A protein has these predicted regions:
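NAD(P)+-binding Rossmann beta1-loop-alpha1 motif at the extreme N-terminus of oxidoreductases
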Residues: 1-58
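Conserved SAM-binding loop
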Residues: 7, 31, 68-69, 132
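Phosphate-coordination loops involved in phosphoryl transfer and adenosine-cofactor binding
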Residues: 3, 87, 127
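NAD(P)-dependent Rossmann-like dehydrogenase/reductase catalytic/cofactor-binding core
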Residues: 195-267
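Amphipathic, non-transmembrane alpha-helical scaffold segments
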Residues: 68, 169-172, 176, 237, ...
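Internal alpha-helical scaffold of NAD(P)-dependent oxidoreductase catalytic cores
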Residues: 18, 25, 37-45, 105-107, ...
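Rossmann-like NAD(P)(H) cofactor-binding subdomain of soluble oxidoreductases
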Residues: 36-122
């Protein structure tokens, strides 16, 4: 029996979405996870007849084309070492873990999808940008071909640039979502649901992508409406108040020409 073309190692959110994308693209897949129950449940979801599950890492074939390691950042290096030398390309999916090369003669790389994943939310993987790095140019090209199997675009990014991409994503996604939590609390206190903000959020994103976020910035800080700023700060306390002050300072600085930018603290 021929070995699967792609072995996915892991059964979390990233592993799940990648496996589904490969299976949908008619790629023969194998799956391994330290949690055998999770692996079998994932295989059942995408189709038991389409995925070969390996209960033991030692049973994973060594002659597959790709080994995609989709585990937590702090588990990547240990799993690569535990897997040992294989014939195919070994690539992890982390944006913040550098390229791993534990074996002198192997082919290693990074296959980083710039997207947030949840177990219960479907993602069109063909629209997710992948950032790839190989330990040689041939491996980099192979990783681009791997993304192309399900129609995704792949861009080259070394460890430094990948870390910058990850940092940008933290600001754009994680921090923004945290602010939505604050907004949700304010709305709840006023008796309104979060979905009243949905049209605003969609239009904010549309304008940011169409015109650039600096040009699309609106609100009391952008127009330096000190009366509104003061009134709103009176309604806040603790960390939300400090965040309001800091972000207002940031917005003000972003609206100034570079030679006029100065650090003005809000009172």
């Amino acid at each position: 029996m021929a070995s699967p073309q792609v072995i996915v190692l892991g059964s979390g959110n990233v592993a799940s979405h990648l496996l589904e994308a490969f299976v949908a693209a008619q790629v023969s897949c194998g799956l391994w996870s330290r949690n055998c129950g999770h692996a079998r449940a994932l295989a059942a979801r995408v189709g038991d007849d389409k995925v070969e599950v390996f209960d033991c890492l030692a049973d994973v074939p060594r002659d597959s084309f790709f080994y995609v390691i989709a585990v937590s950042d702090n588990a990547v290096a240990a799993l690569i070492e535990e897997l040992g030398p294989v014939e195919g390309v070994v690539a992890h999916t982390s944006g913040s873990v550098p390229l791993q090369e534990p074996f002198a003669d192997g082919r290693y790389g990074v296959f980083y999808p710039l997207q947030t994943f949840s177990s219960d939310v479907s993602v069109d993987m063909s629209k997710v940008p992948f950032f790839v790095e190989g330990n040689n140019p041939a491996v980099t090209e192979l990783l681009k071909e791997l993304a192309a199997l399900f129609g995704a675009n792949a861009y080259e990014a070394d460890s430094l640039h990948r870390a910058q991409l990850h940092l940008a994503a933290v600001f754009a996604s994680n921090f923004a979502n945290s602010l939505w939590v604050v907004a949700e609390g304010i709305l709840k206190d006023a008796g309104y649901p979060l979905d009243v903000l949905e049209p605003l959020l969609k239009e904010t994103l549309r304008k940011a992508m169409a015109y650039g976020p600096r040009q699309a910035q609106t609100g009391p800080a952008a127009r330096n409406d000190t009366k509104v700023l003061s009134r709103q700060m009176e309604e806040l306390e603790g960390i939300p108040l400090e965040i309001y002050r800091l972000i207002t300072e940031l917005i003000r600085s972003q609206q100034m020409p570079p030679d006029e930018t100065e650090n003005k603290e809000i009172q």
